[in-house]
Amino acid sequence: MGSITSNWSALKQNGIFIAILSSFLQIAPIFTMPVSGALCTSSVGWPTVYYLHGTVSLFLFTFFMLYHRNSPIKHPMMDRTELVKVLFGKGSIYNGPGQHNKKKNKRIPLRAFYSDMAIWAILVASFGNFMGTQLSLQFMPTYINKVLHMPIENTGLASAISPIIMFFIKLLAGQSSDRIKFISDKWKLRIYNSLSMGMMGVLFIVLAFLDPHSQPTLCLVVLIASTCILGFNSGGFFKSSQMVSRQHSHFTLANISFLNCVCMLLTPLLNEVIASDNAPADWAVVLWIHGLILCCTNVFFCVFASAESAAWTLDTFAGAARKTRRKRLVTPIERGKGVEEGGR
């Protein structure tokens, strides 16, 4: 996803591009939740769920391999006007109309990357985001079925409601983030990230206070709302990752994907330790923990977020780094020569 965004997204359309590209997190559950719920209660059983999803995945992968190109320059359906719009302003990747730089800088300045607080703001925010996302994706059906005691055939349908709403919120957030001009880019990042992660954290804490036995409908509404609101993240840290790291955004998104995998493993472990019996009181603790993580990581992002391209994305930085490395190698050799000549 990072490589595709880096190469194919125009800088002025980062928000909507990221929103559409990352909407797989919403589109997949819209299909998976109700279909799996219907199949697992039918006569064909669970094996059909795996066969169906395997077939769909194979078809989509084949279509992607046939249609996709790594660079817009290599795609036969791209004309010159589209290329200018997509490639313009991308530093070492593109120098202007008809001047694609073949010597584009692929070296990632790791020391500068990991010492940049704007990058740490993105990574910390992504950790909080995916802790909330994985809780919703993996355990929303469990909460609805085991805590709210909704029948399993209705659980899938109820679980699919929030991804549908979240999909449209994500598109709205991406489009509005690109089009709003009366607010600075940095403040837009803070506002959209707070609407997504901050509000999700608050709603998780509110849900922890509600009684699932006497207020099941209200609990379901708050749970769905907490997941839907996360759609605003396309205008938050996701967009910041593109704005800060520019041509190196694929590496930033690779780090974000790694944190998603960490959260994918950490969330079930946390739930197993705290709420293995699915008791409402235990689930309240889980919701409190995730709510605090979301709120704290959002505050960190708001403090250190940036909307400007980092210094290490510029050609001048790469040139200076090469000169510095050359100096470190040449200076000792020259000193050695000076000592030899002095001895003579």
Please name every model-derived segment.
Residues 246-277:
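A late C-terminal transmembrane helix in Major Facilitator Superfamily
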Residues 169-186, 275:
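Helix-to-loop junctions at the C-terminal end of transmembrane segments
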Residues 13-41, 48, 56-57, 162-170, ...:
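Glycine-rich segments within core transmembrane alpha-helices of 12-TM secondary carriers
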